[in-house]
């Protein structure tokens, strides 16, 4: 899980990219990066940590340009370290940066292909670098001195043919524009919007629609599975379906946990989805145990709160805040290591004993991944 953003604007985009990354921070806390372009020159700043810690005033002043992309990273594939911070760069052809959210399931096979057949060197164990080099090879194979939108889309089609798994990508080609594409199953989210200015139309591509709302862009729609977008150097938008076969099969965890509740993903409200999850859970509980005897419903902060509220209303019992959250601790799911996750749960949450003493309590969480959080929370509740 990562967060990506790209903006093709009519004025400086550095601060807007930074703001976008802070709004996507829940999608990754390991590293952050921004790349901008001005007059063919690419300007980059990236590093480990939260966006607020990576970017300083001096960095922002150097990130000049009207077009740029950004990334916040949670390492699902590859090790951690500053070399893995995105966007990632390849010099040939043209000079290309990409920011990738997803996982390639055939990354090991592709690494061998990239080295043996494409004659390209990979410097990290990141599957994002694999995807970048495959896109670059497919674009170079078009054999053009200056790539057109058709060349970009042909390269994306080549990626679809070779890459298996999940990928939502935004990229930047020096002197030529910004591109974005989504895997043929639409596993990871990607939407785009526009903003009218006195100088012309600006476009933004983001992981979650909430970023468009905050930056003043009008949501156009989600990129379809297999679809690609290209905004050329003149600011003209091009769209094309690049996959021969495509079907929407999104990751359910986006609506359950990853996304902010105020986002729309594939035209579905995350907030409304979580409300309905709570209602369905309540209906099942009533069906299986009508004499449940529950005194209070307590959500595990923060993602489960919407579902817990709907569940409590359906059951006709009180909703109480039984855990206080330290908001300076990150999301435990995206902590890089089991020991860190267990330690983080105790630092992150503290039980309000008054809400548990002598009561039959129903705890509501959005999901169980490793069980680390659940074990620690039950111990605290007892």
Please tell me what each predicted stretch does:
Residues 68-76, 187, 213, 328-336, ...:
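Hydrophobic transmembrane alpha-helix bundles
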Residues 297-300, 304-311, 315, 319, ...:
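Extended, hydrophobic alpha-helical segments in both membrane/secreted and soluble proteins
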